[in-house]
Structures are given as C-alpha cells and as structure tokens.
C-alpha cells in the first residue's frame, strides 16, 4: 500500500471532487494531483450532498463490491445491475485505477492493498467542509438516506446514540430510515428527539387512525432557492424485519400519497423537489417513471454505488453506495422556478488520500473509547477474503453458517442475505469489531428447528 506521505504528496484535499473522465485518465498513470481532486463541474445555486447506508461505520473500511447483482425484466443488464468488466465499460472507467477499485471486485485484493480503505466519517467531514467552503455554506444541503444507526459494535452498545451524535456534528439536515426501526418504537422516538433535524417519511401510517406517523416533507432555502425534501422510509420494513418492532404502523410505497405530497410542495413554492428515499434503486427507477414533479431522487437501501446520476424522464436518480465509502453530490441550477441544469458525481472517500478532520476524529475517538479494548480484541485470522455484498451469500455468510452448524449441531444453516458487513483481506486479524459488523442487530436469536424438504424449497431469502 502506498504510504500516507506519498498519498498526501499526490493529493491534498483542501476541497475536492473529481469528474469521472478527467480523474480516470490521470489515475491510469497513477498521478493523482490536487487539481484533479478539485475538478467538478459546479453549477447553479444549490448543492445536495448524500450519505446513505452507513451501517454504523465510523472508521475507514474495506468493502468489496459485488460479484453478482441480478436485475429482473427490463432492469437486467443496466445500472445498477452491472458488475466487474461490464461496469467498467459502461461507465468508461479504466481498469487498475482508483475508480475501478472503488466500484468493482476486479483484482480487488491487490488494489485494496495498494489504495487502502475507504470511508471514515472524519475523512468524509473533510470533504463536506471543503464543499461548503467552495460553494458557500448557504448553498449546501446534507441529507442522510438511512440505515445509519445499525451495523457496528458501538451502535449496538449505544443503541444508535453514537451515530446520532456524529451525524448531528456533521450538520445533517434530514434523514429517512429502515434499520432504525429495529431499535423499537420507544428507542426510535428517543433518538428522533435527539436528532435536531427531521426524520421524514410520508409512507408510514398509523393503522388505527390511518394518519401519517411522521412528517412527510421539510422545506429548506439554499442559494435563494426553495427546496422541498420528501422522505420515504423502507416500504417493506414489517416484512424484512420483525413486525412487532413497528406494531400499529403500516408501511408501503403509497404512490398516490407521494404524488399528493409532491403536488402540495409545488403549490407551497418549492422550486426543487427532492425525494430522499430508502426504497431501493429498482423501486425508485420505476417510481421516477410514474410520479410527476420530482427533480432528484437520492436513493438508498440496495447499496448501489453509481458514479454519476441517471436520468429517468425529468428526474435525476443518484445512489451513493454504503458504509461511508462514498459521498454523493448533485449541483442544480434553477431558473424561473425550474431546474434547468445539473451536475452529479459520486466521490470515493479514499482515507489514505483525504486527511481526517481533527474535530471529527476527536469526537469519534471519544465515542469509541469505552469500547475500544473489546472492539480491538483479536479472535482469529482469515486466510481468505471475507466479504458480503451480492444478491445472495458472501464468504462471511459461509463462516457464519458453518459456525451455526458446528455449534448448534444442525445439518443445514440459513442466514439472511444481508448486504451490510465489511470486508477482510487475506491475512488480516479478525476482531470483535469485525464480527459485529456482520451480526450487530437487536434481534440476534438463532433458532434450531426441524424442517422438511418441502418447507426448505418454499423459503425465499
């Protein structure tokens, strides 16, 4: 791996951003320079920044992109359902470059050893502060796409309080959720009260009164432009997770409700309408073709990292990856109350290149201090690459299932095909932190039951 000093010589990040083609070209020669990192086609009066699916990760991580990402029907063979060489070709990314490493599994291990980990919220903070400085603080809106509070040892021990504290320090201005609901309704409400910004979601209704549980929309003025942010929580939460955790609440996509909320926002003077969504990429692609009046969809849930926004009719759709690996950015120009131009990019947060923000580092260290000894406790070493991410299982799932078979004396073991969970390279130590990045949840029970072959054949994960 390049040394920190070499990386800093290659790139200082006083501000940042890289337009895909220009950065890709210089990266092929391994000559990243400051001007390349600063290169972004800034436009208009407004900048949207998007973080999503961080799954409790405060520190830099390895996170291997998928080996499979199957699309169904008309979604087959198009983003985000492209992997490896097909992904590189579609987005005009040269192999063996930083972008190729950030976005595909091609030659993942040697490239990971060269370019290092990505993410770490203190490194992301450096980028956010640089963009705010570049654009002007009054033009930037930072939004959180959910699945933020769950997924690590510290998030489990603090029941989400660690991530709430950090996201407040980042000056986040709105969020939506999914795994946030698995803390239970009482804890969810406690954490929402501590946020200091709205937990938006117009698609969750009280089953007794058939009324919205959360506010649907928040208005912001940035760069003299009125922006409406409409929230969409994960619509299948009671199916994907235990329904008792959201008792009395009904979830769904609710297209009619969403269209009404968009129309209402327009009538109230919104010049930009943003859907902050945890629907998943394919659902939001379909939604964008059915709902009128949405300018931008910032999508999450499926962990797809798309290098730039994809336009569907009049809507720009951006998916900003997961685990803190990326920061999404969209600039918008508004004229006569309408969006007339946009520029978008997904910024890989290379932690060996981007210096950490000292204040955020101090906060993260303070949060982790009571748990540091246990987090760092080594329980083994991996001989092979351990990862999760695809539609089905990864090698971490194999380890978990093999362990359950051995410890619970079973013939078959089943594990949900989660997409969250960080990666370990061959030869790395396995720590408690690593184990909890795969297993941290508020309903961790393992059940041993008898099943017939017919029952097994009916299971869909």
Where are these regions (language model features)?
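Flexible glycine/proline-enriched surface loops and loop-helix/loop-strand junctions
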Residues: 314, 383-388, 440-443
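Acidic, metal/ion-coordinating pockets
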Residues: 2-13, 18, 23-352, 359-360, ...
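Hard-cation-handling environments
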Residues: 355-430
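Active-site loop ensemble at the mouth of alpha/beta enzyme cores that anchors a bound cofactor
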Residues: 423-445
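Conserved small/polar residues in nucleotide/adenosyl-binding loops
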Residues: 459-461
């Amino acid at each position: 791996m390049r040394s920190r000093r070499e990386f800093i010589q290659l790139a200082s990040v006083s501000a940042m951003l890289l337009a895909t083609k220009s950065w890709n070209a210089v990266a092929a020669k391994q000559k990243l320079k400051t001007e390349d990192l600063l290169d972004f086609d800034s436009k208009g009066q407004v900048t949207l920044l998007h973080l999503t699916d961080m799954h409790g990760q405060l520190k830099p991580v390895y996170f291997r992109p998928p080996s499979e990402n199957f699309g169904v029907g008309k979604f087959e063979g198009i983003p985000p359902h492209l992997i490896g060489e097909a992904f590189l070709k579609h987005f005009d990314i040269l192999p063996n470059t930083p972008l190729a490493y950030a976005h595909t599994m091609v030659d993942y291990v040697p490239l990971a050893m060269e370019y290092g980990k990505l993410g770490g919220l203190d490194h992301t903070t450096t980028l956010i502060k640089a963009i705010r400085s570049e654009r002007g603080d009054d033009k930037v809106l930072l939004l959180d796409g959910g699945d933020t509070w769950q997924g690590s040892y510290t998030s489990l021990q603090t029941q989400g309080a660690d991530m709430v504290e950090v996201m407040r320090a980042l000056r986040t201005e709105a969020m939506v959720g999914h795994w946030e609901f698995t803390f239970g309704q009482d804890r969810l409400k406690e954490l929402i009260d501590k946020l200091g910004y709205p937990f938006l979601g117009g698609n969750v209704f009280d089953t007794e009164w058939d009324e919205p549980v959360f506010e649907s929309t928040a208005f912001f003025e940035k760069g003299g432009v009125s922006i409406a942010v409409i929230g969409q929580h994960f619509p299948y939460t009671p199916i994907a997770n235990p329904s008792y955790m959201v008792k009395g609440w009904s979830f769904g996509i609710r297209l009619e409700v969403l269209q009404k909320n968009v129309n209402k926002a327009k009538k109230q003077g919104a010049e930009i309408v943003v859907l902050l969504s945890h629907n998943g990429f394919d659902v939001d692609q379909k939604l964008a073709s059915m709902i009128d009046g949405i300018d931008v969809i910032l999508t999450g849930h499926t962990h797809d990292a798309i290098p730039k926004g994809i336009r569907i009719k009049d809507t720009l759709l951006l998916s900003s990856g997961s685990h803190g690996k990326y920061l999404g950015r969209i600039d918008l120009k508004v004229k006569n109350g309408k969006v007339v131009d946009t520029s978008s990019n997904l910024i890989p947060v290379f932690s060996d290149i981007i210096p950490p923000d000292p204040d955020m580092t101090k906060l993260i260290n303070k949060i982790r201090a009571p748990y540091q000894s246990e987090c760092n406790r080594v329980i083994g070493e991996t001989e092979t690459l351990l990862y999760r991410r695809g539609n089905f299982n990864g090698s971490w799932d194999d380890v978990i299932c093999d362990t359950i078979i051995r410890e619970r004396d079973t013939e078959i073991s089943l594990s949900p095909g989660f997409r969250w969970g960080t990666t370990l390279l061959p030869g790395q130590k396995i720590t408690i932190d690593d184990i909890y990045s795969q297993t941290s949840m508020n309903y961790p029970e393992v059940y041993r039951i008898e099943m017939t072959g017919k029952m097994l054949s009916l299971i869909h994960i």
